[in-house]
Amino acid sequence: MLAEKTRSIIKATVPVLEQQGTVITRTFYKNMLTEHTELLNIFNRTNQKVGAQPNALATTVLAAAKNIDDLSVLMDHVKQIGHKHRALQIKPEHYPIVGEYLLKAIKEVLGDAATPEIINAWGEAYQAIADIFITVEKKMYEEALWPGWKPFDITAKEYVASDIVEFTVKPKFGSGIELESLPITPGQYITVNTHPIRQENQYDALRHYSLCSASTKNGLRFAVKMEAARENFPAGLVSEYLHKDAKVGDEIKLSAPAGDFAINKELIHQNEVPLVLLSSGVGVTPLLAMLEEQVKCNPNRPIYWIQSSYDEKTQAFKKHVDELLAECANVDKIIVHTDTEPLINAAFLKEKSPAHADVYTCGSLAFMQAMIGHLKELEHRDDMIHYEPFGPKMSTVQV
């Protein structure tokens, strides 16, 4: 436990963090990645450019400051971030570097207002927070299905929508990975380690991709959406490489499956609480794995499948979804094409899905923020709203 004086100083900085938090974290990333270019092999530079990662870190720092008297209340958030850290192979030796540049950024942004007393207090607080993460992540490393990065062969590559490719991969001979014995949880993701020779890239590029199925019978399957170029931003570095360059027979490195986005096993065998699977675009991927699990365990449970995409061509996994839903005894299938229909809103959800359902939703950060807001507006219980955004999850959290 931090000293009371230290905690008081930290809490006194909450107002300035609310105003300047993102400025501090942008400064932190700029300085750290300029002076420690080796970390560009880990950090997603797109998330830096669009502000998602600085926003997420600012939210995390603010949450820590507000809860400095009892950091245990943040444990769910710590575990979510810890899964990403383990998947990216972030290690204890990285934490002192982060701490050094975070304190420097606070000093740079706040200037004379960042007194030695404040900097010392945040130094102590950061170490306490880092120790929590290191402890949580140590257990995750111990429980990982395999250590580090392992080589896999791409055995299949298939378009499941006009802009989404499903990859099937198998571990290379001698990797020590036995597919048949891997206990995959529906909703988990794998992390790929690539080195695209595009866009003047000099570094490894790591990305998380949700698994399409918990079944490992024919290999691990994950889906990748082509992130097209848009104003001020080039095409997605890794998605472009995987869509255009990676081919069957190529080798790709993966870290072990990670993530805590998982269907509630206590509800999977009952029929009173319906299941709502609400997705947008490639966000359908982890929900497809959950649908498979639900159908396998109990096809009689009421299911509401709500899938949004721009048009029919970008609607992923149509055939597989229809095959699974055909096995269900009580299902509502709702497809939304936003080129001709309005975006999903609270009124839509109120009409199309029951208020007492267990809801799982996945999509872009903007989609997730909207869906969480709509569900809360409709007074869905927080513990019945489960979500996985494609981007830093703390960007969707209000503290």
Swiss-Prot record:
Q: Where does heme b bind?
A: 85
Annotated segments matching region Reductase = 146-399
A GO cellular component term found in this entry reads: cytoplasmic stress granule
Write out the catalytic residues in the record. Answer: 95 (charge relay system), 137 (charge relay system)
- Which transformation does this protein catalyse, written as a reaction? 2 nitric oxide + NADPH + 2 O2 = 2 nitrate + NADP(+) + H(+); 2 nitric oxide + NADH + 2 O2 = 2 nitrate + NAD(+) + H(+)
Into which EC class is this enzyme placed? Answer: oxidoreductase
Its subcellular locations are: Cytoplasm
Q: What is its EC number?
A: 1.14.12.17
Binding positions (FAD): 189, 207-210, 389-392
Q: Which GO terms describe its molecular function?
A: FAD binding; heme binding; metal ion binding; nitric oxide dioxygenase NAD(P)H activity; nitric oxide reductase activity; oxygen binding
Phosphothreonine modification sites are 22
CDD domains from the xrefs? Answer: flavohem_like_fad_nad_binding, Yhb1-globin-like
Q: Where is the Globin domain?
A: 1-138
Binding sites annotated in the UniProt record for NADP(+): 281-286
Locate the site labelled Involved in heme-bound ligand stabilization and O-O bond activation. Answer: 29
Please list the GO biological process terms of this entry: cellular response to misfolded protein; cellular response to nitrosative stress; cellular response to oxidative stress; cellular response to reactive nitrogen species; nitric oxide catabolic process; response to toxic substance
The Swiss-Prot or TrEMBL record lists the needed cofactor(s) as: FAD; heme b
Where in the chain is the site Influences the redox potential of the prosthetic heme and FAD groups?
84, 388
Is Zinc-finger tagged as a keyword?
Answer: no
**Binding note for cofactor:** Binds 1 FAD per subunit.
Coarse class of the primary localization is cytoplasm
Q: What's the miscellaneous note? A: Present with 13000 molecules/cell in log phase SD medium.
Query: What is the UniProt domain comment for this protein?
Result: Consists of two distinct domains; a N-terminal heme-containing oxygen-binding domain and a C-terminal reductase domain with binding sites for FAD and NAD(P)H.
* Protein family per UniProt: Belongs to the globin family. Two-domain flavohemoproteins subfamily.
**Protein's UniProt name:** Flavohemoprotein
